[in-house]
Amino acid sequence: MANSPQAKKRARQNEKNRKHNASLRSMARTYMKKVDAKIKAGNHDEAQAALKEAQPIMDSMVNKGIFAKNKIARHKSRLNAKIKALKSA
């Protein structure tokens, strides 16, 4: 357990930041799931719009250090590929 005042403060800040980051992570995942749901529904235009809405949020999570850059790039790439496959199908 933290003994010095600054260590106690850091422990408080770490807990607060952990909770905040968890909510941001959850929000980003929700946006990704919304895009996936639109893809599974088979609606190309809605899926494209949902991805357009989700991309800036996903990018901001990278800038905040919530997700790794490659993870978000991989998700965006896969979602985009699924949407393109929808259009051709």
From Swiss-Prot:
Q: Where is this region: Disordered?
A: 1-26
Q: Which UniProt keywords apply?
A: Ribonucleoprotein, Ribosomal protein, RNA-binding, rRNA-binding
This protein's GO cellular component annotations are: cytosol; small ribosomal subunit
Q: Where is the composition biased (Basic residues)?
A: 7-22
Q: Superkingdom, according to UniProt?
A: Bacteria
Q: Which SUPFAM superfamilies match?
A: Ribosomal protein S20
Q: Which InterPro entries match?
A: Ribosomal_bS20, Ribosomal_bS20_sf
Q: Which GO terms describe its molecular function?
A: small ribosomal subunit rRNA binding; structural constituent of ribosome
One biological process term from GO is: translation
Q: What does this protein do?
A: Binds directly to 16S ribosomal RNA.
**Family assignment?**
Belongs to the bacterial ribosomal protein bS20 family.
Protein name per Swiss-Prot or TrEMBL: Small ribosomal subunit protein bS20
Q: Which organism is it from?
A: Marinobacter nauticus (strain ATCC 700491 / DSM 11845 / VT8) (Marinobacter aquaeolei)
